[in-house]
Amino acid sequence: MANTKRELFLKRRLRVRNKLKASANGRLRLSVHRSSKNISAQLIDDANGVTLAAASTLEKGLGFFGKNNVEASAAVGRTIAERAKAAGIEECYFDRGGFLFHGKIKALADAAREGGLKF
C-alpha cells in the first residue's frame, strides 16, 4: 500500500523530533512551520514550555504578509536571529518538522546562521 503525502510527512516529523530529543542536552529548539501562504519560526524552551522568540511572514512589519517564497523565508530567518541575539540566545537546534531541508526551509536556516545562530 502506498503512503500518502501526509503519512510520509508525519513519519518524517516523528523521526526528526525523536533524533532531536536524543541530542537536545537542554538546548533551545528553533521550530519551523511552513504553510501554503506563510512561514514561521519559533525559539522554544522545551524544559519550561515557553516560546522565547518568534518571527513570521504574518507580521506586518516584515512586509511579506501572505507570502511564502524563498525571499520571505530568508527575511524570517534574519528576523529570528536578531530577536535571538536580543534575548541572549546563541545556540539552538533546528527542528524542521516533517519539511524537507531545501528551498524555503534551507533559506530560513541559512539566513539564521548568517545572523549569528549556531545549530
Curated annotation (Swiss-Prot):
Gene3D superfamilies linked to this entry: 3.30.420.100
The record ties this protein, via InterPro entries, to: Ribosomal_uL18_bac-type, Ribosomal_uL18_bac/euk
Keyword presence, Ribosomal protein? yes
**Can you cite a GO biological process for this protein?**
translation
Q: Does the keyword rRNA-binding apply?
A: yes
Q: What does UniProt give as GO cellular component?
A: cytosolic large ribosomal subunit
Keywords associated with the record: Ribonucleoprotein, Ribosomal protein, RNA-binding, rRNA-binding
Q: Which GO terms describe its molecular function?
A: 5S rRNA binding; structural constituent of ribosome
NCBIfam families (UniProt xref)? L18_bact
Subunit relationships: Part of the 50S ribosomal subunit; part of the 5S rRNA/L5/L18/L25 subcomplex. Contacts the 5S and 23S rRNAs.
Instruction: Give the family this protein belongs to, as stated in its UniProt record.
Output: Belongs to the universal ribosomal protein uL18 family.
Q: What does this protein do?
A: This is one of the proteins that bind and probably mediate the attachment of the 5S RNA into the large ribosomal subunit, where it forms part of the central protuberance.
- The name under which this protein is listed is Large ribosomal subunit protein uL18
What organism does the UniProt record list as the source? Cereibacter sphaeroides (strain ATCC 17025 / ATH 2.4.3)
